Amino acid sequence: MEESHGSLEIDGSTQQDLLYPLFFQEYIYAFVHDHGLNVNGSIIYEPMENLGYDKKSSSLSVKRLISRMHQQNHFLFSVNDSKQNRFVVHKNRSDFQMISQGFTVILEIPFSLQKVNILEEKKIEKFHNLRSIHAIFPFLEDKISHLIYVSDILIPYPVHLEILVQTLYCCIQDAPSLHFLRFFLQEYRNWNSFITPKRASSFFSKENQRLFLFLYNSHVYICESIFVFLHKQCSHHFRSTSFGAFLERTLFYGKIEHLVVVVVLRNDFQKSLGFYKDPFMHYVRYQGKSILAAKGTHFLMKKWKTHLMHFWQCNFHLWAQPDRIRINQFSKHSLDLMGYLSRLRLNRLVVRNQMLEHFFIIDIPIKKFDSIVPILPLIGSLAKAKFCNVSGHPISKPIRADSSDSDILDRFGRICRNLSHYHSGSSKKKSLYRVKYILRLSCARTLARKHKSTVRAFLKRLGSEFLEEFLTEEEQVLSLILSKTYLASHRSHKERIWYLDIIRINDLVNFEFKD
C-alpha cells in the first residue's frame, strides 16, 4: 500500500497554479482568436464558425469586456433585485462566448504542460497519428478479435454542476479561478447541456464547443480513473489505451482506499486486486461510450460491472443504472462505435493435406474483425439534414437565393467526399453507393429547383461534369495505382483503408444506435 501511494501523487507545481489573473490579460483572448483562425486549416470536416470562434472579435471588444469584469457590480448576485444584477453575459452574448473561450484556454494550460511531460518521458513519436479516429480500428483488429466477451458501457453523467467544479479542483488548486468558473456556469441555467449533448442548445454545442469538450473530458477522466490506477498496479497484466490523457488527481489514493473497504470488503488489497487481473483485457473509449473486452468468463465481466457501478456511485456520486453496462458475447454481438458497425466474421480457410495415398480436407475457421457502414442510421441522418425523406428518397434542399451553381456543387461534393473518406475502412463499399446516389440526386433536384427546370433536363445539360464532383478521393487515388480491371472486380469493394488525418467525426455519422 505504501508503494502505490507515491505513484499516485502529482507534481507539487501543479497544485500551486495561479490562473485567475490571466482572465484579465488581453493576450489570452488574442490567442483564442488566433487559434480559431489556425484551426481551420487542420480540420477538414467542419467550418470554423462551428468550432466556436467568432470572426468579429476585436481588441476593442476585449478591452471593454475586461473593463466590465473589473467592475465588481457586474458579478454580484443580488437576491432582492436579481433581474437587474444578472451576470453581464445575459446582456451580451458575445461576452459569454469570449469568456467561455478564455476559460478553456486558461484551464488547459496545466493539462497541456503535463501532457508534454508525459510525451517526453514515454518518448512517443508521431503523436499526431494517435489522435486519428481511424487509429482505434487497427488496434481493435489486432487486439480484440480473439476475445470472448464485450461490455458496452455508457459513461454516467454527474447529477450536479458542483461535481464538475470539484473534478477540476482535484487537478487545479486555484480557488479564485474555480469560484469564477462555478459562478459562470451557474449563471448559465441550461447547465445540463454540458453533459448531455442530445439536450445541448445550439448555442452551446456550436459556439462554446471547446469549453464543453474540456469539461466533459475532465469528467470522463473521473470515470476512467480506476483503469489508470489498475494500470499502475499491474501494468504487465492490464492494458489501458486511455492511460496518459491526464495525470493522477489529488486525493485519488484515499478514494481508492475507501473503495477497497466498501466494495471489495477485504483488507488484503493485493489479493483482491489479483481477482481482476486479466492478461487479455482491453479498454477503448470514444466520446461517451466505452468498450471493455476480455477473454475471461461471464462471471468475471459481471464482477467488473458491479465494481464499476459501485466505484462511480460511492466515490464520485455518479449515478449509473445497470442497463448502462451491457455484457455480450463478441461472436454474437456487433459494436456500434464512431459511425461503424463492427463485428467478428468467420472466414473459412480450406486446406488440402496429402499423407501418402490419403487426402485430407481441413476446414479452418478464422476470426476476422469486420467493420461495415450501417446504412439505415446514415440515411436517417441524411433525412434529418433534409437531403432525403425517411425512406431514403432524395429531395431538394432549401438554399440561399444568392448561392451560385458552383457553390452548391462544391458543397454537395464535399459532403460526399467526406463521408466516403470517413467510411473508407468499411469492408462493404456498395452500401455507400446508395448514399452517393442520394446526395447526387438531391443536388440535381436542388439545382433544378433553383433554375425552375426538370431534373432530367438539368442532368442532360451538365453531363459528365456533374458526376466528377462526386468522384471520391479514394477512387481517384486507387485509379492511379491500380488497374481498371482490378477496380472493376468484386474484390475492390472489400478493400479497407484507414486514414490517420481524421481527428473529428462528421456530424452526419455522429448518430447513436437505438434498440
Swiss-Prot record:
Annotated Gene Ontology cellular components are: chloroplast
Localization, per the record, is:
Plastid, Chloroplast
| GO biological process terms on file | mRNA processing; RNA splicing; tRNA processing
Q: Which UniProt keywords apply?
A: Chloroplast, mRNA processing, Plastid, RNA-binding, tRNA processing
Whether Plastid counts among this entry's keywords is yes
Q: Which GO terms describe its molecular function?
A: RNA binding
Function of this protein?
Usually encoded in the trnK tRNA gene intron. Probably assists in splicing its own and other chloroplast group II introns.
**Matches recorded under HAMAP family:** MatK (MF_01390)
Family per record: Belongs to the intron maturase 2 family. MatK subfamily.
Read off the PANTHER family from this record.
MATURASE K
Q: What is this protein called?
A: Maturase K
